[in-house]
Amino acid sequence: MHDLQQEKKLVLEYFNSINNANSDTLIEIISKYTSSNFKMRCTHPFNELSGAEEIANNLWIPIKNSFNPIQRRMDIFYAGINSLDNNEGKWVTSMGHLMGVFKKSFFGIQPNYKSILLRYAEFYKVENNKITEGAIFLDIMNFMQQLGLPVIPESTGLVCVTPGPMNHRGLKYEHSNDAESQKTLELIHRMRDRLVKGSNMKSYKDELTLDWHDDMIWWGPGGIGASYTIDGYVKGHTKPFHDG
């Protein structure tokens, strides 16, 4: 298996530098860690961004201006090889919440001057000790639900701030066991292929039991919400889609 410690170190340094940067230094910080053709795919309204200046001005400065002070609270951190990129692309992933005091308007959403958590998931590709590509997903719907804004119908699952793993071991700073990592990857691929291609099982619930424990927890985004157990997932997540 690949040793991705250097890639993880680079991305952690990038996170820390972004966290400590101000509006005047963000472009310089992003340029230091990224390639000249660095691009980001982001949640709307940020969408696709290219280059340090555009990413600083259109992504991080609006976030840091609206939520101040702000801190990154990571629950998940790991690295891996992208199997969809000829098993060559080295990616580092992080998930958690950006916590801050909501002090200034955020794309038309008015502040409540209270602490708030913005759920995120980030993915960064590293090549030649530079970040060349990234994606960030921000749970804007859950953020609006925390504010009590009735912009969408009631969620079919639990509306909450997503906790980290129950064993609190989601931060993989050190090298992970290769055999366990491979087993996990194979399970995810098996589940993905079954969901896309279907199986010969009589029901969707029976199909899920092939890959999931009964006490599986689905931490869905705002608008869907979280579901506990396979029965809960079918009721709170799958059935509404099938009914629609």
Regions found by a protein language model. Give the residues of each.
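C-terminal and inter-domain tail/linker signature
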Residues: 1-244
